[in-house]
Curated annotation (Swiss-Prot):
UniProt keyword list: Ribonucleoprotein, Ribosomal protein, RNA-binding, rRNA-binding, tRNA-binding
Cystine pairs: none
Stated role: This is one of the proteins that bind and probably mediate the attachment of the 5S RNA into the large ribosomal subunit, where it forms part of the central protuberance. In the 70S ribosome it contacts protein S13 of the 30S subunit (bridge B1b), connecting the 2 subunits; this bridge is implicated in subunit movement. Contacts the P site tRNA; the 5S rRNA and some of its associated proteins might help stabilize positioning of ribosome-bound tRNAs.
UniProt cross-references to PROSITE patterns, sorted A to Z: RIBOSOMAL_L5
Lineage of source species: Bacteria, Bacillati, Cyanobacteriota, Cyanophyceae, Synechococcales
Protein name: Large ribosomal subunit protein uL5
Amino acid sequence: MPQRLQILYNTVIVPKLQKELGYTNIHQVPRLEKIVINRGLGDASQNAKALESSIAEISAITGQRPVITRAKKAIASFKIRKGMPVGLMVTLRRERMYAFLDRLINIALPRIRDFRGVSPKSFDGRGNYTLGIREQLIFPEINYDSVDQIRGMDISIVTTAETDEEGRALLKEFGMPFAS
């Protein structure tokens, strides 16, 4: 079933951006490709409980089980051996991606303390946007009592936009609250 933002994109955003950016073909209009949620877990190698609770939290937030990222090589000063778990990652596409973006923009971001909008400078030069979240409690799926430690995550929104201006225009149409 198509998500609310997906319907909005197809009916309102595409024609508006096509006119705004001067495209002749609707396939030239930038679109969302995927959303990648990443969480680094420094203590996961020593603390298996932290890994399990993080898997449960990210599964609840995204509706998809995360993949465990492992160390590529040993780093003695961090007490990490090759193959040890160092983080979690989820790649969302299609309906789940639009559902997550909808919840992020309309529910989670406004719940951040002293929220004045997300930084418009976090584009990578190719139209992709990344934001860091300091605590997982902003998501309504997380039960406050079940959280053992406050952990953040990185959210990367990958678009087909070729410039930052196109990416910003696309996310602004979706309702992303950029700080002025």
